Amino acid sequence: MSELIDVCPEAELPAGALRTVEWEDMEIMVVNCGGELLAMEDRCSHDNGPLAEGEIDPDQCTVECPRHGSLFDLRSGRPLTLPAYVAVESFPVRVQDGIVRVEVE
């Protein structure tokens, strides 16, 4: 059964901004990529490094792992370059009553 996790008010996540939220034992990063709100696990599948500390390309909607440079698609969690080759989990995002929420299961 899914649940919604509150991230922040929508006004606090303008284009290019990033927030992280903890759910159970997982960190989830939420990014406003040109007006599109995207969420995925904040963990590189190559070495468990925090992706939220990497560089985000808002034009391509990607994040670069700060440790070894793997690029991940923010929409799907899919790695686009090596050394990572396993996707990280992505999550639906919605705005309800002005609050950004991530849907988790």
What are these regions (language model features)?
Residues 2-10:
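Short amphipathic
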